[in-house]
Amino acid sequence: MRNHCLELSSNCSSIFASSKSNPRFSPSKLSYSTFFSRSAIYYRSKPKQASSSSSFSTFPPCLNRKSSLTHVLKPVSELADTTTKPFSPEIVGKRTDLKKIMILGAGPIVIGQACEFDYSGTQACKALREEGYEVILINSNPATIMTDPETANRTYIAPMTPELVEQVIEKERPDALLPTMGGQTALNLAVALAESGALEKYGVELIGAKLGAIKKAEDRELFKDAMKNIGLKTPPSGIGTTLDECFDIAEKIGEFPLIIRPAFTLGGTGGGIAYNKEEFESICKSGLAASATSQVLVEKSLLGWKEYELEVMRDLADNVVIICSIENIDPMGVHTGDSITVAPAQTLTDREYQRLRDYSIAIIREIGVECGGSNVQFAVNPVDGEVMIIEMNPRVSRSSALASKATGFPIAKMAAKLSVGYTLDQIPNDITRKTPASFEPSIDYVVTKIPRFAFEKFPGSQPLLTTQMKSVGESMALGRTFQESFQKALRSLECGFSGWGCAKIKELDWDWDQLKYSLRVPNPDRIHAIYAAMKKGMKIDEIYELSMVDKWFLTQLKELVDVEQYLMSGTLSEITKEDLYEVKKRGFSDKQIAFATKTTEEEVRTKRISLGVVPSYKRVDTCAAEFEAHTPYMYSSYDVECESAPNNKKKVLILGGGPNRIGQGIEFDYCCCHTSFALQDAGYETIMLNSNPETVSTDYDTSDRLYFEPLTIEDVLNVIDLEKPDGIIVQFGGQTPLKLALPIKHYLDKHMPMSLSGAGPVRIWGTSPDSIDAAEDRERFNAILDELKIEQPKGGIAKSEADALAIAKEVGYPVVVRPSYVLGGRAMEIVYDDSRLITYLENAVQVDPERPVLVDKYLSDAIEIDVDTLTDSYGNVVIGGIMEHIEQAGVHSGDSACMLPTQTIPASCLQTIRTWTTKLAKKLNVCGLMNCQYAITTSGDVFLLEANPRASRTVPFVSKAIGHPLAKYAALVMSGKSLKDLNFEKEVIPKHVSVKEAVFPFEKFQGCDVILGPEMRSTGEVMSISSEFSSAFAMAQIAAGQKLPLSGTVFLSLNDMTKPHLEKIAVSFLELGFKIVATSGTAHFLELKGIPVERVLKLHEGRPHAADMVANGQIHLMLITSSGDALDQKDGRQLRQMALAYKVPVITTVAGALATAEGIKSLKSSAIKMTALQDFFEVKNVSSLLV
């Protein structure tokens, strides 16, 4: 059994040793004597009794509190009685009266609702099917494991509206509805279905959370009253349903700032912090519009208070357990999804933790969540310990996924089983196989989660953090101390940091005013501002006063700065084995040490290994090593004992995609999971390495072994050295593992490690790193295309500003410019003249020989095509799917709607595409997946835009459109199977039409323009399937949240380049009964064509103008394309923002407008018909092909 005590022994720390061994590491040089203080986790004397957070028996001395919480909080006995009446024994235990259960998914990935609900939904489907229930699933997101046809018995990939869900209920007749696995989307749907009478009409029971409990937790007024009933405090507040009511509440509270929280919304959408009356009015308007019940809570600000969360579970026998405590490093005022969080809570005494635990149990009982998981959020005053209850989520949440991965306790799986009658003591713990789920998890490590942001994708928006969530992803890391897990989590973000500090960061060049502002005002880079402030000599007390980040955390961070300073004061050769162990125990990466000692990462690694300083791997076991863990879920540390125990089976290491970001999201995790499933079926042990807590890939039972580690070359090579797998797969995780392909290959070529199975050397499976580089290196790729006689747009590689201007002059404007080696169109732009090109080169990118910029002719008015193809190691190539984009070329493929099969492309063009794709796959020696993008001009010329010999974000969509799991096939061909073995030898062209539409987070980023371009900005996608394109497109728009009007007024404002299409667009909407209004130039064009149109003023032409019509509800659909004129650009931007604020559908491309007209025509002529995925094609059982 491992030692629970994480306190470092002074005997093993040479930094504490006498100056005789190494004078540079003398204690006398420390800034204070507590340099290497103990972790916040202490030895627990009664682990069986305590929960994950109850181990903190000693209160950190640096906390600025006048007293303990004891005198402030009521004893448990003083809480109002919330015990429930005993449950009747006949309903405790698995229910046999239920046969069919419907699960509501979460829909597309949006900010505030991401992969974690695929994780929870997948767990729920598996858990219920294990128990023999028939599962019906509704979800519009194709990039999910839960929507695979084998996950549920009946799968509907369709819009999630009350009317369409009711249609499925009528058709499938489920006995029960489980709404707690799909986030806010599912909860709101369940409430709507219950209140409309649909559930009662068809005899459907809500399980997991009853209607009363959902409303009591989600309705701000009911929740406030409930807390009052049990004697718990909430911030002084009031409920407003109109703007006047909101101002009345503000008057009563009496001071700014004020927090505005809309009811029944996701990720704080529509809410915020108001510091004055103008901001208050704006946020209240937004919140009232965003709330499903037009209700907002206006409450006193608790800015600067500490924030904690507890994950709670309750069963039908009224057993309640606390799964995990979570502490936000950022104080109140920052949405918990945007805060750096730590589990278990680090700055609570045991007594304080027990109080919050008691409150959580009282709350879940008062709200009435009979069974399942809930998340409770607390605010604690750092001065006197006063506690306020912030909110409660009566469902599986983002924090639930984090708590599940942090503890190994599968909250969603347990919640699903509890919903059908099981009690916690009746469900075994999968990890220990000896303890029941009623044992509260105990953990002997620290977990840190850090959010990832994408403000650079939304120019014009302010990079500030408030109560409205804005992060697009997150990383998580585990370590034996906070310092270790924090540094690992930071380098897991893949934002250019190898840890905290030991790097050239912009904040070091800031003056004191800039630094103080960044410390005071929450922003994505505040943690780096803390580093810069400490480096510049700012004291902990001052940083605390500015940031309100707890002094315990600041003390821990200051120690890291001191370690960095020690490293910088000497050379690598001076560092002893003991010194290196102490530095690595604090999470410092080889790259950080190299920076500090002015050496290279490879030199540090060589020295470290020569000294025998290698990581050990610990198991996540839910019980702090009290019982053996049977599931190999590992994290690295520089502790003594290694618990990994690798074996000599045939095995494959799969590198995941890391944290979600725009351009690399759930689609790549989907591919990684399918790879693992397929190779397990083929008899391989699969090993997953990833750092994203939201995903299915990091579920402990997705692969045979899981390493929760950063995706850096250091951490990956450490696992390779330990496991020595037969193969390493880099093709499925997006750009993250691809960047590691060449360094891994160089390492394998140099050291030639042999696999533990004895089958030969460790090697990268699939397409070679050299072929990947050939496709991404522009000069090599151009040479290949010239050899194969494949056409591409005219262009060149610019290594200076002069090069770029010369290429643009040669090919002619407009041109597309972008840096090489990017994903998601990062820093890609269309420019129309020299001045804009110069501006781009000065502001967006650095151009030099080391960082060339690609300059290509922009093919305006061309149609873009996406092709996913599959190639085996025998040279056989099969087209997986050819997708036609609805938006013209120039809009990033990830942001464009697309359809499969193609609808308007001539057969000759399709044949050219098939021929070129096949030739290229063979030339690059592709083994696995490849994605190619083409453009077809109006004259029928075909051009190849780019090729990526890896899995693309369209693979899940294509797989579900054609009924073949392409990622599984790709994994199997890498293992040596042929496409003939898999019975996949020719392109499948389905009879039905599938449409994929992108979903955008514009409402979260006020001030940014919603117009689409070559830089990807969508966070997720939806899919629909129908017999005709028009109905499939309409369904996709509804699923994406676009409420298409069936009548009313259409506003048109088109630039000169798109006016040739204007007549067709206007006639299409007139024939549907719409009225047309247009700005002067557009109206003049239509009048010349004899088309009835009403003129409306542009914003700079006077009042009433187009924005007034939007505000007055006189415009129901808008088409605005951007022109080069500065005033028109400003007007168009403001109108598009106005449309977003008033929820008016806005279209920014001609093709999108024409498709929308077709979709509206379909909606007016016939009702949407819901069809299960299993009715379109037979479910493919890949394992049967391997027999």
Curated annotation (Swiss-Prot):
It comes from the Eukaryota. Residues 1042-1183 form the MGS-like domain. It catalyses: hydrogencarbonate + L-glutamine + 2 ATP + H2O = carbamoyl phosphate + L-glutamate + 2 ADP + phosphate + 2 H(+). Binds 4 Mg(2+) or Mn(2+) ions per subunit. Residues 1-62 form a transit peptide. Mg(2+) 1 binds at residues 377, 391. Its EC number is 6.3.4.16, 6.3.5.5. ATP 1 binds at residues 220, 261, 267-268, 300, 302, 307, 333-335, 377, 391. Pfam families: CPSase_L_D2, CPSase_L_D3, MGS. InterPro entries: ATP-grasp, ATP_grasp_subdomain_1, CarbamoylP_synth_lsu, CarbamoylP_synth_lsu_oligo, CarbamoylP_synth_lsu_oligo_sf, CbamoylP_synth_lsu-like_ATP-bd, CbamoylP_synth_lsu_CPSase_dom, MGS-like_dom. Mg(2+) 3 binds at residues 933, 946. Its cofactor is Mg(2+); Mn(2+). Residues 495-644 are annotated as: Oligomerization domain. The keyword Transmembrane does not apply. Keywords: Amino-acid biosynthesis, Arginine biosynthesis, ATP-binding, Chloroplast, Ligase, Magnesium, Manganese, Metal-binding, Nucleotide-binding, Plastid, Pyrimidine biosynthesis, Repeat, Transferase, Transit peptide. Residues 93-494 are annotated as: Carboxyphosphate synthetic domain. Heterodimer composed of 2 chains; the small (or glutamine) chain promotes the hydrolysis of glutamine to ammonia, which is used by the large (or ammonia) chain to synthesize carbamoyl phosphate. HAMAP family: CPSase_L_chain_A (MF_01210_A), CPSase_L_chain_B (MF_01210_B). The ven3-1, ven3-2, ven3-3 and ven3-4 phenotypes are rescued by exogenous application of citrulline, an arginine precursor. This is Carbamoyl phosphate synthase arginine-specific large chain, chloroplastic. It comes from Arabidopsis thaliana (Mouse-ear cress).
